[in-house]
From Swiss-Prot:
Residues 9-198 form the RNase H type-2 domain. InterPro entries: RNase_HII, RNase_HII/HIII, RNase_HII/HIII_dom, RNaseH-like_sf, RNaseH_sf. It comes from Christiangramia forsetii (strain DSM 17595 / CGMCC 1.15422 / KT0803) (Gramella forsetii). GO terms for molecular function: manganese ion binding; RNA binding; RNA-DNA hybrid ribonuclease activity. Its main location: cytoplasm. It is found in: Cytoplasm. The keyword Nuclease applies. Its cofactor is Mn(2+); Mg(2+). This is Ribonuclease HII. Belongs to the RNase HII family. Its EC number is 3.1.26.4. One of its GO terms (biological process) is DNA replication, removal of RNA primer. The lineage of its organism: Bacteria, Pseudomonadati, Bacteroidota, Flavobacteriia, Flavobacteriales. A divalent metal cation binds at residues 15-16, 107. The gene is rnhB. Endonuclease that specifically degrades the RNA of RNA-DNA hybrids.
Length: 198
């Protein structure tokens, strides 16, 4: 894990979570870490267990120079598509920062310019740069918390466990109970995604 993209300028890392889900928002975070920040556990959120993610969430919130988290909800996802919604969520997370960075590094290969600030897309960046890894952790933990909250309203879909991803269990629940207000209507839920092969 590289500490910093460039120590001579202020760099924000950005990442999103929930892009491949059938339900819930897409959530993004942007993080600017201090140059002296170090943590051996920090890595891509997908590789960490729940305990480590929650520990790092608190650590990042305490030690980041500034961070922002933003959701784009189902209606907007359906209107502008999931790729644009993911980029919009990252833009909104950047807007929440206390100040603009000199440069933005983004996990993945697609991004639209934000306020004329130079940016670079880095494939698997959440496993390469600490600020992107930190953003991936905040995006995932904030989104997971939201999904656990709405699980109480619709427990049949078990969002507490699947977080809205298209698991067999989730697809079976959609087939049995239909879609909710939290489902993304732009995803083709019928018939292919409802085929369940046990």
């Amino acid at each position: 894990m590289l500490n910093f993209y460039n120590t001579k300028i202020t760099v924000a890392g950005a990442d999103e979570a929930g892009r491949g889900c059938l339900a819930g928002p897409v959530t993004a975070a942007a993080v600017i870490l201090p140059i002296e920040f170090k943590n051996a556990v920090l890595n891509d959120s997908k590789t960490l267990n729940l305990k480590n993610r929650n520990f790092l969430k608190s650590l990042i919130e305490d030690e980041a120079i500034t961070y922002g988290v933003a959701h784009v909800f189902m209606k907007e996802i359906d209107e502008i598509n999931i790729l644009n919604a993911s980029i919009l969520a990252m833009h909104r997370a950047l807007q929440v920062l206390k100040f603009d960075p000199d440069h933005i590094i983004v996990d993945g290969n697609r991004f639209k310019p934000y306020q004329k600030i130079p940016h670079e897309c880095i494939i698997k960046g959440d496993g390469k740069y600490m600020s992107i890894a930190a953003a991936s952790i905040l995006a995932k933990t904030y989104r997971d918390e939201f999904m656990e909250k709405i699980h109480e309203e619709f427990p049949d879909y078990n969002w507490k466990k699947n977080k809205g991803y298209p698991t067999k269990e989730h697809r079976a629940a959609i087939k049995k109970y239909g879609v909710t207000k939290y489902h993304r209507k732009s995803f083709k839920l019928l018939p292919d995604q409802l085929k369940i092969d046990f």
